[in-house]
Amino acid sequence: MKKMITFYLKQISPILVIGLAIVLGLNLVGVTMNMLEGPDLLFRAIRGTTVMSLLLILITTWKITKLDSSKENITLVSLSRYAEVTKFFGKLFAAYIAAVTVIITQSAFIWYYGFTTDRIATGDVWSFIAGLGMMFLFIFMFVCYFVIPVSWLKDHVKASYVQKAGVIILLFGILIFNLLAEYYLHIYNSAGVISILPDGNFEISLLSIVWNMTLCAIIAGSYIYHKSKKSDTI
């Protein structure tokens, strides 16, 4: 498993290194301007680099998890004896490692800004831990709601325009399904709320976490089962 995770990380290392260098460079510019002009410019820099960090996480997750998922992106791992479930979680863990690297880099500057402006206290570390856990869930949701459907379509649909239409239909289908669940079950407005920002402005209900984890587990389980049956047939 360790060798497989390392292999997948090496496949996206150029993108990850370049992205981190850009984020780090812009944040350092913000810190320098903070010393010269005040915290307002640092806040602008951090706001921009936070968006860039989220995009970098999505890109690296997409690049890793799409490997060995369809005929178009087979690697040496597909020629190994790894089971499909091992490959799936190997890619997921590799995506998590890349995401944690980005998050820690960006969070260092966020906390620096928060401490220098007294907007974040030491006791707010729980929000950081909760936010990190939620980022893991968001990555899992991104893989299950987007990467897996796209990979499935690429294996079963040849025409590119049909693939694109299929992706849009699937995404809308998942969105509508979740909206219906919210309408009838109130999963996103139920009791038991976790705040992942120090000021409490971004809160998520426990029921919505359980709902999305269950839905993702069903999608991932079906995908792994299908890939395993296909491998056994071959």
Model-based region annotation:
Residues 78-84:
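Short helix-to-coil transition segments within interhelical loops
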Residues 1-73, 84-234:
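Hydrophobic alpha-helical transmembrane segments of membrane proteins
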